[in-house]
């Protein structure tokens, strides 16, 4: 694959969270954020005139918790949640989800190594602590979705999610690219999981660049070895943009909230 260039001033930057900005952890709530990351994202937001968004499988409130005090434009739950700069979070409703929860809770009771994670309009079953249970999880999800309406399964790294049908990270990126300040820019999306492939396809269709974090088959054009390499590239790009002779004073200021505004992630 070709070498990843530094971020240009005309970039619309889209970043996955887990496995991209942050290293993966045994459980979602145990993820740690590198101390310098928030400052780097703030600088990038300013130098890109606000054209930076986080595109994640997590709920947006959890992203706010990890990245506080920043409240960046974001798409959560693979596009089922959406927030423009400083705006309210809009959600794709999933009324068929609640009847499935008792069946999934019974599965977790039967296999205690599994983790059930509620995500407002989605639910995830994690099997990172017991990879041998992948087939059992897949079969259980297929069974509970048999008569569900408006929901679909989304496999990921040691996880299967049930989310609203017809939304994905590619749709979220395409929606951002139709609005200011993202419109008319060159999109770049970095992600690590199979759930990020629609995002890679979307930026390629729009003439942009997909960046895979890790190594596997992908439609992304460029790859980096892991989250540490991705963060290093972000730091170097932020420094280069801020140091540019033509940079001038930043014109965009990210929306920020006081401590504790983001929801602390939990699993059930």
Describe each model-derived feature in a short phrase.
Residues 8, 34, 165, 170-268:
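Mg2+-dependent phosphoryl-transfer enzymes with acidic/Ser/Thr/Gly-rich catalytic loops
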Residues 32-119:
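Active-site phosphate-binding/coordination module
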Residues 6-26, 54:
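Asp-based phosphoryl-transfer active-site loop
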Residues 77, 83-103, 154-184:
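Substrate-recognition "cap/lid" segment bordering the active-site pocket of phosphatases
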Residues 12, 51-53, 73, 152, ...:
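Proline-centered loop/turn at the N-terminus of a beta-strand
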Residues 114-132, 151-163:
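Charged, glycine-interspersed solvent-exposed loop segments at helix/strand-loop junctions
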Residues 1-9, 61-67:
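Short amphipathic alpha-helices and their capping/turn segments at secondary-structure boundaries
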Residues 58-75, 133-152:
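Substrate-recognition/cap helix-loop segment adjacent to the acidic, metal-dependent catalytic center
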């Amino acid at each position: 694959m070709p070498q990843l260039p530094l971020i240009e001033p005309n970039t619309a930057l889209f970043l996955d969270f887990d496995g991209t900005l942050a290293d993966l952890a045994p459980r979602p709530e145990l993820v740690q954020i590198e101390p310098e990351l928030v400052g780097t994202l703030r600088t990038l937001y300013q130098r890109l005139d606000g054209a930076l968004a986080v595109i994640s499988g997590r709920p947006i409130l959890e992203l706010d918790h990890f990245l506080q005090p920043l409240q960046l434009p974001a798409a959560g739950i693979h596009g089922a949640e959406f927030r423009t700069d400083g705006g309210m979070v809009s959600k794709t409703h999933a009324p068929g989800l609640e009847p499935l929860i008792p069946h999934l809770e019974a599965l977790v009771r039967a296999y205690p190594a599994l983790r059930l994670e509620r995500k407002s309009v989605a639910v995830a079953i994690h099997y990172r602590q017991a990879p041998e249970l992948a087939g059992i999880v897949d079969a259980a999800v297929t069974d509970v979705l048999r008569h569900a309406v408006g929901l679909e399964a989304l496999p990921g790294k040691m996880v299967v999610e049930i989310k609203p049908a017809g939304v994905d990270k590619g749709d979220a990126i395409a929606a951002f690219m139709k609005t200011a300040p993202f419109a008319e820019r060159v999109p770049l999306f970095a992600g690590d999981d199979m759930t990020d492939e629609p995002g890679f396809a979307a930026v390629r269709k729009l003439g942009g660049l997909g960046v895979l974090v890790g190594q596997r088959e992908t439609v992304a054009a460029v790859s980096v070895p892991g989250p540490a390499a991705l963060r290093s590239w972000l730091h170097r790009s932020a420094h280069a943009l801020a140091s540019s002779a033509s940079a001038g004073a930043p014109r965009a200021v990210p929306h920020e909230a006081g401590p504790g505004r983001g929801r602390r992630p939990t699993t059930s």
